[in-house]
């Protein structure tokens, strides 16, 4: 969405759950902006295609995959996420869906669950999996509440300061070390 803001010069698209913690409110806000400015799904897909991975992200993900099953729990939408997932080597992505009109406008969004990230963690745990979670925003707090261990990665100071009980890292190496430290399989 920040790339949509950059492409369209409409700064309001740069708001994230860091700014509007309730994801439903944020998406309602974004859809109203899209309608107001006549933007379509293709505008968002084009922005998604322009995104580059953060430096070191793919190397980190590949190293972590050597020891862990990796699932991306995201508040994005399948209709938007494909370019980024391709760059990440298509990890398992659990996210939401959009309703698209015949003219390509985004009519609505469909959340899989109000607290989809938390529900996914609980589902994996119900099958006997131990879950370590990492995120950078308010919408990740729901999964930290139930994960066996949660970590902030590159979170804004405001969020990590508000939640000092959650370890915060600014490097993938430190996060990888924390994952390994909390693993039951790696010694």
Task: Describe each PLM feature range.
Residues 79-131:
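Substrate-recognition "cap/lid" segment bordering the active-site pocket of phosphatases
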Residues 94, 166-175:
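Short acidic-hydrophobic, aromatic-tinged amphipathic segments that line or gate anion-handling sites
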């Amino acid at each position: 969405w920040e790339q949509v803001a950059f492409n369209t010069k409409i700064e309001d698209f740069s708001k994230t759950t860091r700014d509007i913690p309730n994801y439903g409110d944020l998406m309602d806000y974004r859809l109203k902006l899209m309608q107001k400015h006549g933007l379509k799904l293709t505008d968002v897909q084009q922005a998604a295609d322009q995104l580059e991975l953060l430096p070191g992200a793919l190397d980190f993900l590949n190293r972590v995959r050597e020891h862990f099953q990796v699932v991306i729990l995201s508040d994005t939408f399948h209709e938007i996420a494909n370019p980024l997932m391709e760059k990440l080597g298509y990890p398992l992505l659990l996210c939401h869906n959009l309703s698209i009109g015949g003219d390509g406008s985004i009519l609505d969004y469909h959340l899989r669950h109000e607290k989809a990230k938390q529900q996914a963690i609980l589902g994996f745990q119900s099958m006997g999996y131990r879950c370590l979670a990492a995120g950078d925003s308010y919408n990740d707090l729901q999964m930290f509440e139930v994960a066996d261990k949660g970590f902030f990665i590159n979170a804004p100071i405001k969020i990590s300061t508000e939640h000092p009980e959650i370890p915060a890292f600014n490097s993938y190496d430190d996060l990888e070390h924390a994952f390994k430290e909390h693993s039951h399989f790696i010694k």
